[in-house]
């Protein structure tokens, strides 16, 4: 039987300062010559993701750390030994009988916004250890209740971790397959029975395959948090919804300016093409397998982004987009056969991303309900 969760209305909750529960230790500087691309250990410093790898380590697994310089306030619980850089600090539980390690991690995660607010500085933000030690942390007195709460939240994290592994595997496989397909790797073509590509693969400009349309400006009051048709602008993700789409499904789009310039999207349902985007509708829908061109453009995406970002005022005009050369196969059947191999991997990748995003939202919502708000 699953134990009943103790919500934040429970009278057994109290609060203690971070310094009374943990021993804090600042990380160490890692010399550049100790960085190794194939090193045994990850090196975490001031970023959420690893800053590199090394063959040295200074922190054991199952250690909590907080970033105090850079992405200030981010709380991490390592599952492997690693090197903790000087822009992070480690937290060691002083009394394991008073606070469970996993519960401690989630208690700190529930206070990330407050931890982040401790950062000071003009250009480079930092958190002083003295300020961190005075931060109040929510604590439920019963160690068993702590473990019950930690278990409920860790179920989500285990699934999210598994999804992240699947995302990485599918991303690598998709990129590997795309490279082999569009470089006409002989072994790959033999394996998938795509020999005809040797004779049929050529190049064509986007303007010869697609009708390109610039995005349309839409007032804020015409966009909604929920709805049927997604709105896409200059960001990778949909930011809102609209009542009426201006572009049909089975279409592509390219981000025309801003930080994400050159990013390619495939839309399976009708959508609204907003400011900062270029929509691409097939000129001959019955003779164009759109996912094939999506996979081709995704394969080219990194080079396209680098090319456009080199410009003084990065912006992709309709003319420039229409002149982009992409791999082309005249046979619709061959487009479909080749494109599906890559597209199905990309689709699985996106499904894993969506599930992970949804679970993170549910977990964070539960985190807020389980832990009380401290004054």
Curated annotation (Swiss-Prot):
Induction: Highly expressed after 6 and 96 hours growth, there are fewer copies at 96 hours (at protein level).
Source superkingdom: Bacteria
GO biological process: DNA restriction-modification system
InterPro entries documented for this protein: Restrct_endonuc_typeI_TRD (IPR000055), Restrct_endonuc_typeI_TRD_sf (IPR044946), Type-I_RS_S_subunit (IPR052021)
CDD domains: RMtype1_S_MgeORF438P-TRD-CR_like
The entry's keywords: DNA-binding, Restriction system
GO molecular-function term, one example from the UniProt record: DNA binding
PANTHER family attached to this UniProt entry: TYPE I RESTRICTION ENZYME HINDI SPECIFICITY SUBUNIT, TYPE-1 RESTRICTION ENZYME ECOKI SPECIFICITY PROTEIN
Role description: The specificity (S) subunit of a type I methyltransferase (MTase); this subunit dictates DNA sequence specificity. The single R subunit has multiple frameshifts and is probably not expressed.
Quaternary structure, from the entry: The methyltransferase is composed of M and S polypeptides.
Entry domain remark: Contains two DNA recognition domains, each specifying recognition of one of the two defined components of the target sequence.
The protein's name in its UniProt record: Putative type I specificity subunit S.MpnORF638P
């Amino acid at each position: 039987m699953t134990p009943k969760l103790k919500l934040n209305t429970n009278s057994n909750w109290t609060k203690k300062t971070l310094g009374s529960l943990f021993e804090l230790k600042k990380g160490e500087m890692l010399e550049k010559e100790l960085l190794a691309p194939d090193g045994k250990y990850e090196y975490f410093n001031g970023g959420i993701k690893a800053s590199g790898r090394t063959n040295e380590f200074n922190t054991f697994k199952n250690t909590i750390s907080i970033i105090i310089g850079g992405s200030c306030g981010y709380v991490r619980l390592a599952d492997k030994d690693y090197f903790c850089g000087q822009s992070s600090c480690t937290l060691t539980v002083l009394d394991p009988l008073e606070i469970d390690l996993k519960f401690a991690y989630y208690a700190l995660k529930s206070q990330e916004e407050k931890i982040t607010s401790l950062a000071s500085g003009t250009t480079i933000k930092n958190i002083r250890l003295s300020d961190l030690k005075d931060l109040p942390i929510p604590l439920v007195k019963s160690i068993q209740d702590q473990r019950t709460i930690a278990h409920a939240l860790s179920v989500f994290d285990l699934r999210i971790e598994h999804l992240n592994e699947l995302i990485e595997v599918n991303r690598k496989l998709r990129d590997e397959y795309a490279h082999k397909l569009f470089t006409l790797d002989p072994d790959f073509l033999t394996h998938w029975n795509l020999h005809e590509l040797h004779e049929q693969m050529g190049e064509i400009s986007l303007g010869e395959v697609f009708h390109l349309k610039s995005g349309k400006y839409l007032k804020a009051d015409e966009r909604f948090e929920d709805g049927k048709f997604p709105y896409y602008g200059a960001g990778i993700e949909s930011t809102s919804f609209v009542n009426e789409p201006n572009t049909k499904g089975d279409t592509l789009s390219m981000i025309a300016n801003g930080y994400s310039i050159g990013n390619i999207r495939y839309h399976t349902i009708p959508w609204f093409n907003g400011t900062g985007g270029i929509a691409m509708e097939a000129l001959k829908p019955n003779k164009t397998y759109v996912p094939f061109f999506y996979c081709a453009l995704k394969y080219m995406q990194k080079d396209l982004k680098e090319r456009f970002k080199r410009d003084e005022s990065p912006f992709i005009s309709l003319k420039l987009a229409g002149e982009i050369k992409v791999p082309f196969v005249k046979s619709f059947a061959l487009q479909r056969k080749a494109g599906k191999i890559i597209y199905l991997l990309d689709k699985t990748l996106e499904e894993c991303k969506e599930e992970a995003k949804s679970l993170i939202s549910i977990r964070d919502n539960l985190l807020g309900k389980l832990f009380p708000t401290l004054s």
